UniProtKB/Swiss-Prot annotation:
<keyword id="KW-0238">DNA-binding</keyword>
<dbReference type="GO" id="GO:0010227">
    <property type="term" value="P:floral organ abscission"/>
</dbReference>
<comment type="subunit">
    <text>May form heterodimeric complex with the TALE/KNOX protein STM.</text>
</comment>
<dbReference type="GO" id="GO:0003677">
    <property type="term" value="F:DNA binding"/>
</dbReference>
<keyword id="KW-0539">Nucleus</keyword>
<dbReference type="Pfam" id="PF07526">
    <property type="entry name" value="POX"/>
</dbReference>
<dbReference type="GO" id="GO:0003700">
    <property type="term" value="F:DNA-binding transcription factor activity"/>
</dbReference>
<feature type="region of interest" description="Disordered">
    <location>
        <begin position="448"/>
        <end position="473"/>
    </location>
</feature>
<dbReference type="InterPro" id="IPR001356">
    <property type="entry name" value="HD"/>
</dbReference>
<dbReference type="GO" id="GO:0010073">
    <property type="term" value="P:meristem maintenance"/>
</dbReference>
<dbReference type="InterPro" id="IPR006563">
    <property type="entry name" value="POX_dom"/>
</dbReference>
<dbReference type="GO" id="GO:0008285">
    <property type="term" value="P:negative regulation of cell population proliferation"/>
</dbReference>
<dbReference type="GO" id="GO:0043565">
    <property type="term" value="F:sequence-specific DNA binding"/>
</dbReference>
<feature type="region of interest" description="SR/KY domain">
    <location>
        <begin position="205"/>
        <end position="221"/>
    </location>
</feature>
<dbReference type="GO" id="GO:0010371">
    <property type="term" value="P:regulation of gibberellin biosynthetic process"/>
</dbReference>
<feature type="region of interest" description="BELL domain">
    <location>
        <begin position="266"/>
        <end position="336"/>
    </location>
</feature>
<keyword id="KW-0805">Transcription regulation</keyword>
Amino acid sequence: MDNNNNNNTFSSLDNVMTNQNPLLMDFIPSREDSTSFSTMLPWNTIRSDPLQMGGFDIFNSMLTNKYLSSSPRSIDVQDNRNVEFMAPPPHPPPLHPLDHLRHYDDSSNNMWGFEANSEFQAFSGVVGPSEPMMSTFGEEDFPFLISNKRNNELSLSLASDVSDECSEISLCAATRLASEQASCSSKDISNNVVTQGFSQLIFGSKYLHSVQEILSHFAAYSLDYSSRGTESGAASSAFTSRFENITEFLDGDSNNSEAGFGSTFQRRALEAKKTHLLDLLQMVDDRYSHCVDEIHTVISAFHAATELDPQLHTRFALQTVSFLYKNLRERICKKIISMGSVLERGKDKTQETSMFHQHCLLQQLKRKNHQIWRPQRGLPEKSVSVLRNWMFQNFLHPYPKDSEKHLLAIRSGLTRSQVSNWFINARVRLWKPMIEEMYAEMNKRKLNNSHIQPNGPTLRMPKSVMMSQAMHK
């Protein structure tokens, strides 16, 4: 069976090599179809005359040099009529007519320009009808090795079987993928080491607890604002539009105010605008005072509920509100002063009157120009009024019990310690002088009655009243 296959193979090769020249010329690579022949033939078998390519010389030299003199392992005749050629790297003849058709590297004596340390692959020629050839190399590296011929034409393949080609392709891809994964894994390991060291440094810091507490407060505020976002959307848009209107009003064209003061209408318009600015300034002052009172009330309520220091929570709010208030107030003041100076140009007044008017205006504008973030001394007026009302309602027993202190702290927004301290001070500063004054008035009336009725009964003065009178004397 093997002998028959060998005879068929060599007979088919004999038929091909003894055919006419046009069919065999397709066996020679060209620039238009350089991939139709990719086997490496010994250059010493090709003569300088290209017309002798169609004779028996090339076939006899090929059989003599390659097939008959090689070992049995170099000739592999298979059932699918594939013949493998194992050729060492040949030395090309000088100035061959086909030198321009082949890829040759003179420095390495390599026909196709391969690297010097690379080995030649086994090339197999397929005679007869075949499928389009698949190459184990990439198109970008060796585009001339790929052949896509029509049926019933001669086509050459780089491997003996499609499965071998696929296995080689998959092996190359797996090798490349493994190298890329190894490089990526080394980078990931280095990044993980740096991240773990940084996390250990953070968890070992002594400021970790404080930073976590501050971040928890900010997160709570963010959640609160997000929950109230839908409710405050309309209010924030209204405030933004109102602030834009104020800005446009303040940044109005000054040329309109300086030009054409001869007319009375423009002067009246400027005076009305100045009056409007003064009202706006007063409204800003009132709103700011109300906002600060509300902030202090919230501080007191928070301190009463949690017994924690609220300065951490209110510092940013007070500074932000104070900054916005000072900025808006300064702009309004500058606009009013500029309008006043422009109006003074159109009036026939003396220098003393104008200086006095500006001085009074500046004094009015600087009425609340102080450090806003300075802590307020004393308790809020609202809380003090609640405590004072309770003291007058319980005038005979002005010091509250523990349960009453708790209720008063909730109503006034203060802590229990603040309520206790206020009643201690109020009992000394308010209640005791009032009691002494009441007893003095009663004794005075009794003395007046004793002069009228000498034998009438006398009241005994309290010891505290007697001591206070002695101290006054």
